Amino acid sequence: MGLQMSHELPVPPAAAADPKAVEIARIWASGGAQHVSLATEIWDDPAAWGLMLVDLARHVANGYEQAQGRDREDVLRRIRTGFDAEWKSPTDVATGGLVE
């Protein structure tokens, strides 16, 4: 059984209602760094993670639009700018290993 955190986000209703739903990623901000837990075995082709990341960016843009009234396309452009900048000149190095 995992640690229950007070700052944990809620499970989306559709996922909670689906007995076949699988969590694929968790990301925490802690101590000035990101810490992740990933279900890397979920897809055979790593390109599927690229599709998921684009879908995630769209969900983030929708969230900014709904919560702050920001233009969805502007938000997506800012996300892409940040993604491209980090890809070109990483500000951090991914470390760590698989934890079971």
Protein language model features and the residues they cover:
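Solvent-exposed interaction surfaces and binding hotspots enriched for charged
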Residues: 2-100
